[in-house]
Design a protein with these regions (language model features):
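Hydrophobic, small-residue-rich membrane helices and short re-entrant helix-turn-helix hairpins
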Residues: 70-76, 132-145, 177, 194-229, ...
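C-terminal membrane-solvent junction of multi-pass transporters and transport-like membrane proteins
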Residues: 348-428
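Membrane-interface "cap" regions at the ends of multi-pass membrane proteins
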Residues: 2-98, 105-107, 179-186, 204-216, ...
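Loop-to-transmembrane helix boundary motifs in multi-pass membrane proteins
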Residues: 121, 298-332, 373-393
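Hydrophobic, membrane-embedded alpha-helices of multi-pass small-molecule transporters
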Residues: 76-93, 156-162, 173-240, 264-289, ...
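Transmembrane alpha-helical segments of multi-pass small-molecule transport proteins
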Residues: 111-131, 146-156, 191-199, 304-325
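Hydrophobic alpha-helical segments and their helix-loop junctions in multi-pass secondary transporters
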Residues: 126, 130, 147-173, 188-193, ...
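Membrane-interface loop-to-helix entry segments
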Residues: 120-159, 217-219, 338-345
Length: 442
């Protein structure tokens, strides 16, 4: 994690403007504000925006202990509900559709792969919550799950009778192979593990005395229940497509149309439920958008000077335009882009795990040096290992646009990119890191 924070100016400090509003200033040794007119203007804009609106303007800077929330009885319940609400959304149902429709798995095969993949991915990402670990968002997630789970329960009642839970879907569909099971398992794992890099962003205001193991249980339970439920619902919808003409036509239009068709038995009320299910994806978009603003601030030493709300607004405009333009290609995007994201995330994951348990041996980070590049690792070992990990991903990937030589050499094509990316990175990082420590000393 420290490698990603290299490059920050040690003179960027936090200036208090109120109990919950924080902005960034570039301070010189004589406490005079320096920089270009644009930089000063951005800093002033951030302060004014935070004071007038009350919106959290804090960026990537460390939250001091005296600014954190006091311990409360519902702390771990809030963690549980945040992840439950974030994953109990329609887009995770779409992941489940691909088990029967893309890989030819029946109900039991797809359900086992999905549940195991989701739980494994969630367990790993919540390790980051417990180890590293937004006021309005947290308030929203305390209650959003109620509406979302009621809507999903209505979907089960409406569409459940059409689910085919028999061992084999149809004699016309080829039997699923081991490679199909592994590919779908990897897809479900990828849908969960993609939360890992951002998983600590939402609990920075929690007290430092928060128990890691309780955070792990709360986070993993909430996310696992939500993602397992929604993915299995998607599997059920996919198994019933061939026996329902309306579902066939809807699935040819888009995955979203299939979700709406699952409520068709309820007529007007069903259309209302479909709208509620669609609006529920807000719970999934909020944390992603929040974290993306922090990620943009980490791109360079000047990033923290741009207010996070301004970056967030820019992101929303960009991804809204992209969503409108690409709305007809959601299936292709989910099939191709989700595994691609998992390649770099598992390589990053291998770096973090080995740094934490081999070189730091479970010891905490020195958070006081988070923005001091002279004391942080240079990232040479991490960068070189990451390149090896991506090489492994390229060799083992099996996508519609490219099949790696290792995947192509298998009797049955299977996407091994994620597993090879993790393996290649994990093998070379210890040697590279030892060399970096010996030569550089940090």
């Amino acid at each position: 994690m420290a490698d990603t924070e290299q490059g920050y100016d040690p003179k960027v400090q936090v200036k208090e403007t109120g109990p919950q509003v924080h902005t960034l200033e570039l301070l010189s040794t004589d406490a005079e504000l320096k920089g270009s007119s644009f930089q000063r203007g951005i800093a002033v804009l951030g302060r004014v925006f935070g004071i007038v609106s009350g919106v959290e303007a804090r960026g990537i800077e460390r939250v001091a202990d005296d600014e954190r929330q006091a311990p409360a009885p519902n702390t771990y319940t809030r963690i549980f509900l945040l992840w439950l609400s974030s994953a109990l959304t329609g887009n995770n149902i779409i992941v489940g559709l691909y088990g029967p429709s893309l890989y030819g798995l029946d109900w039991s095969q797809a359900t086992i792969c999905a549940t195991l993949g989701v739980i494994l991915g969630i367990s790993i990402l919540t390790w980051f919550i417990a180890t590293l670990g937004v006021h309005l968002f947290q308030f929203y997630t305390r209650y959003a799950w109620i509406i979302q789970i009621l809507t999903l329960a209505i979907m089960i009642g409406s569409a459940g009778p059409s689910f085919i839970t028999s061992p084999f879907l149809s004699p016309d569909i080829p039997r699923a192979t081991v490679s199909d099971r592994l590919s779908f398992f990897s897809l479900c794992f990828a849908s969960a593990i993609t939360w890992a890099p951002a998983s600590a962003d939402y609990f920075v205001y929690f007290p430092t005395a928060t128990k890691s193991w309780r955070m792990f249980l709360a986070g993993s339970t909430g996310m696992s229940l939500a993602m397992a439920l929604t993915t299995i619902l998607g599997i059920g919808l996919a198994t019933g497509i061939d026996s329902n003409q309306a579902w066939i036509e809807a699935s040819l239009a888009s995955p979203g149309s299939l979700l709406a068709a699952s409520f068709s038995n309820l007529h007007g009320f069903g259309r209302f439920c479909a709208v509620i299910l669609l609006l529920g994806t807000v719970s999934n978009n909020i944390p992603c958008t929040y974290s993306a603003g922090l990620n943009l601030q980490m791109l360079g030493r000047y990033g923290p000077r741009i207010p996070r709300p301004l970056l967030t607004t820019l992101e929303v405009v960009i991804y809204t335009v992209c969503a409108i333009v690409a709305r007809e290609y959601l299936r292709e995007i989910m099939e191709n882009f989700l595994p691609l994201m998992s390649y770099w995330i598992v390589a990053w994951l291998a770096l973090c795990l080995e740094e934490a348990w081999i070189f730091r041996r479970g010891r905490d980070y020195d958070w006081a040096i988070w923005n001091n590049p002279n004391r942080l690792p240079m990232g040479l070992a991490a960068g070189a290992s990451f390149v090896f990990g991506i090489l492994g991903a390229v060799l083992g990937m099996s996508q519609s646009y490219f099949v790696g030589p290792i995947a192509n050499a298998l009797p049955q094509k299977c996407d091994l990119g994620m597993w090879l990316a993790f393996g290649f990175t994990a093998v070379v990082y210890p040697a590279f890191r030892c060399a970096e420590l010996r030569v550089v000393g940090r």
